[in-house]
């Protein structure tokens, strides 16, 4: 038997600053679905995840908790692993950056890069964001705050080591241009090229002296290694890389990675810093980096500081593991952010899982028992209506494969559930309960039930990658024509009011302080005060990507670069501009509008337009060329 082709997939390692919410957990579930699917195709999959455990933020968190940093990360890492296991993820290795072998390799890598002249000693002076563990110049800040998370930054001035990023920039640009699959989706590639690589890279600070919780630079121990140089190398240290030339057989088998699956907020680190580090180490680059969108909790990106957090274990208590897996995989678009709420979860639970799937299996098992004592065979009494069901059944595996090759996991799940919907329609078309009344049609009835069992079973086999427990339960009940005596209820319908009542008991509402950035009415009032007007914040943005919103005749979804941030904005402008025409335009953006979902797609602001008497729209753009997106708009 020929050796299986290896497939190495990784997630970003989870930062151990606290318990992961469902937005964090989405990534491990997504990676697990891909890993399981690749295994089903015959690949020898190695799936690595883990925890990122160093940095100033953790040092401060541990101090607040009254424990050592190691005690703090031991506890949080254990909690993260517990949740990953709860979600039935099939990872092969859980790496921790406090693992002794990882720390030793990071020190050796740092020394190698220093010895060959890629790292040099200097002094850093600028701004530092502790939550993001990132350095910024004054010009990179947005309103004086971190361009990535919007939090306050602190001035930093200290002796530091720097990596010569510009030395490898042209080589990285060439690689990206000649390997279009390297950064996905394409909008993420455009953002990295236009906003970081093409304007020119600054040398990167790769050590700190202002805190101690990190991997010491062994030849200068007052310095600790920059957390991103430490964390990113887990992808190679976890599979046995040794920069002295003693890498393991596993490393040579698995590297380069087939897929780094990460959140869109850390794509800069994985598509600029990490490839350049690898080039300096003379290692091949990963084949693909996919920056997935965020899973939002109705009113924006989940953040414990905002109090809008949903946790996976709480959702599992209400819905079960596979229902949560189904929701986060099915509801996440390929590129745009998805939304999760208790209401949407209950809706999907009842319509898709309890009705479309659960009721289908229940009816099929019950009818097979009722009419044939639990066992059917193919009597071959075919009718025209059978052909379409068989065609859908035969075509679904290829449709799923095509979607999974593009990492369109939500679309792959839709294909499977379309098969289940077709099975339900087949029951309505053939009406087994009517056939059962005519003894002469008994063989036809048995054929119908046989067809149903075969089609549902094929769908269940495909479902294993996404909902493994449910897949197993369905196949056990159907038994290739020998069904169980009593159908097992796969998913029970839920009452929304009861669920919301329990949620309120679990999380009593807390009176929130009124924020400055309230939702702004889109209908003008007769008069407003200057203070009212001052609540609205307009900035210049540049549209770096745009696409049509599915199932909408007038909406476009734009990725708008504002300073160092990218906002997703859905606008009703499709009849006035094409998606292609939007890209590259400088626009005026209302940036502090509360996020809302339009046609199922999250929008984080609004574009300012002029409208004539006929309703034609024209984007408002700066008259003069502005040096960079992010400039404020003001009235004088």
Regions found by a protein language model. Name each.
Residues 2-76, 95-110, 115, 132, ...:
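N-terminal catalytic cores of NTP/NDP-binding nucleotidyl/phosphoryl-transfer enzymes
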Residues 121, 344-381, 392-491, 590:
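Helix-rich, typically C-terminal accessory recognition domains appended to large enzymatic cores
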Residues 512-636:
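Phosphate-backbone binding interfaces of nucleic-acid-interacting proteins
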